[in-house]
Amino acid sequence: MKKLVGLVLLAVVFVTTMAITSSTPPTMHTMEGTWELQGFYNFDDQTVTDTVNLPEGYRQVKMYYNGKIMWSRTDPNDTVGRFGFGSYRITNEDLIETIEFGDYQMMQALDTLREFTFELVLKDDTFSQIAFDEDGNRTFSENYKRVD
């Protein structure tokens, strides 16, 4: 009987020790949620050369959920609002958005390009999607803050 109690006690100590010392891998940041555009950066030779603030009244929001994206923009200098809907995926370095439909102007643009690939810099409450030219040089970024 003493041996059985000793074995059970040893097993409990072992399991408890393993549970305490086992480390879980850090979780990846997630795109899921609602994000609002804060401003833009312009790049030259991979370096930020200019920060562009949003004009008064300009708002752009992106919502990512379950592999889908929806975005909307309003600009007081443009009487036509903009929106788009599609799917997205992220890799270690990229955000790939495939737009399925949107407003009239977006649908016109979709005749030539439906998939948009950006360099992704993702943190807990901010992200930047960085566009690049055909040579792989950064050109500009949209910078977002999580609102939900």
Language-model regions: role of each:
Residues M1-L4:
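Positively charged n-region of N-terminal signal peptides that target proteins for export
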Residues G6, V15-F83, I96-D148:
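Lipid interaction determinants
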Residues A11-V12:
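Repetitive helical segments and hydrophobic/amphipathic motifs
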Residues G86:
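Phosphoinositide-binding peripheral membrane targeting modules
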